[in-house]
Amino acid sequence: MKKTLFVACCACAALAFCGRAAANVTFGITEDTGALGDPTMFYSTLNDLGATENRIAINWDPAQPTTIPNQPGLDYWLPQATIHAVRVLFAVAPAHPGDITSSPSRINQFAAFLQQLARTYPFVKDYVIGNEPNQPRFWQPQFSSTGANLSGSAYEPLLAASYDALKGVDPSINVIGVGLSPRGNDNPFAKDNVSTSPVRFLHDVGVAYRASKRTKPLMDELGFHPYPNQNNDPPLKGYPWPKAGIPNLDRIKQAVWDAFNGTAQPVFAERGKTAPANALKLDLDETGWQVAIPAVLQNLYTGKENVVTIDEGTQAQYYSDIVRFVSCDPDVRSLSFFHLVDEQPLDRWQSGLLRLDDSKRPSFTSVKNAIAQTQGKCALTPPGWSHTATVNGATVAFGYLGSPKGWNNKLWRFRTTVQEDASYKAGVFKLGSRKLTAKAKKAVLKALANPKSKPLLGAKGTALAYKSKLVALPKKTLKRSGWYVYGIRLAAAMNPQRAFVSVSRPFLVKSRPRARK
């Protein structure tokens, strides 16, 4: 039943849009050197799987700024990647969360290290810059002591310097930005895991980029890690805004558009428009679901499990489904599973296609079959994406307005809901007649859009995602009887140029009774 539902959702998504041609999605494994103990066996296993990419993490330590970690291992392994036609990606990140922000010289040192890597391994053409900098485990500080976000604005100059450094060595190098975590609580005063959501992190990178007046891009692709929120969540469950998962990739694309549209940084191609040659692509370079260890193999693992695991059959289904799902997204260039082989400590990752004894899980066969069947292509017309110019999920309920309101009425209110944070400006507007003419509506909309205009009984505020907001106007009487309307303009917090406006039906305010003589 789960498989039928997932495939049906993929088909419906494909049929719902006018698609565009896209290059095939490629598949890979996020695994450092040492898996299976031998590079020939490792890359032969990737060939058997149908995986053509291997993302390798390289941690830069400012205490040894020119030392390439595990260089003998890389020198031993990487030639086999070339022999087996496996594309290697280096994911280069600071070894400690405060390495970049603790000294003004660190960005230049990091950029110089990237150039050293590029000259040492000229056949490696893909670099991921950083690893989940929206998470405190990998980047600190996330916020200032007053609660202002710092991580996005501090990461932007690192990405810019990295782009320039790598392109200076070889313009054909593919620079992959960010490597975003799908999560983030946006709470600078949280008890733990003080982190930044992916949508807000991209927004802050964009603000810093625009402020820098940079005339060159920051990245060629965007790295994103669409892990589930809870390990036992199915792939299509996703996240609420401003987080994102497998089914929320359009949310990431919109965040990029909000952050960079109109700048030198390319955004994602859009449905119905000719895709520019340099349109941004998604590199989904980490995802995985952890599984329960069979009793006969538990002696190979150490420690205690720290997540709710799924069974191996469910993992196999999820992985196969994901291959098919991303194959129908023309903006995805690649997907990599984390890992090929389990990690030994149970509080780490047992998400591999192989168990710790190197035996194959059912997911190995399911992924192999899915790659072979799809070839990274969509069975139907691939869906496309286009940016929205409005506020996602915005609705307004003005309530019943069919009865006249008394001259002494002081209660003016209605409700609005949104699926992303938004600011609002609202008020009451006088009409010249009982009808809301096109001219009158235009005047209301113009007043709402003008920051200097002051509607009758005006109010401003913030509507939070997924929470019904009571828009309460000042408790005053209207001086004149006649016909009125409510009006509200919502502006997206991530891009105030995206707006939603709504005007109520006209309602009558009765005149004050004449005093008896």
Where would I find each of the regions flagged by the language model?
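Substrate-binding cleft and catalytic face of glycoside hydrolase catalytic domains
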Residues: 46-192, 229, 289-292, 343
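Short, solvent-exposed loop/turn segments at the edges of extracellular beta-sandwich modules
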Residues: 491-498
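Aromatic-rich peripheral "rim/lid" segments of glycoside hydrolase catalytic domains that contact
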Residues: 41, 45, 65, 133, ...
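Aromatic/hydrophobic beta-strand junction motif of beta-rich domains
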Residues: 398, 412-420
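Short, acidic/polar
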Residues: 33-48, 106-117, 197-211, 313-325
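Boundary/entry segment of secreted carbohydrate-active catalytic domains
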Residues: 22-59
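Noncatalytic carbohydrate-binding groove/subsite architecture in carbohydrate-active enzymes
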Residues: 40, 106-111, 150-309
